């Protein structure tokens, strides 16, 4: 056994990109630095890579609670592929390898965003899509795919947790807020 990568605070979702050995991770970053720090992220995992925890984050940004510690690591911190809202609580992720959705979805990442618990304005509570543009590389962008788990008064009625591609090509999403499993099917435009 050996350490493959380090400095990843909380890699909750871990998935291998189909037909490759490339690992991707959805990470819940650190808390207690306010509403807007530190962003959660989704990224491919570089063999031997260092992702900053606990001293650094998002490249060369030092956690103020560790000011002046380990300056030699600053330039080793890998910047993630896709930066999410802080406290989104990105949990499980999957690569879409089904055939039910349009062709442009194949190979893309779908991730469940469980939602914030420690932020003044709620974020997350959705399923997102990270387009890989048939190249296997993320552009840094993501889009909302399944939303509506927070109603106008701020009440949360659903929290996506697990996600997988079903044998028919639909997506299955577990939800520990409504105690449900959702099936997302494509029925055409």
Which residues are covered by each model-predicted region?
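Beta-propeller domain segments
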Residues: 9-10, 14-146, 152-158, 166, ...
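Conserved small/polar residues in nucleotide/adenosyl-binding loops
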Residues: 1-5
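C-terminal substrate/ligand-recognition segments
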Residues: 161-174
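Loop/turn residues immediately N-terminal
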Residues: 30, 178-179
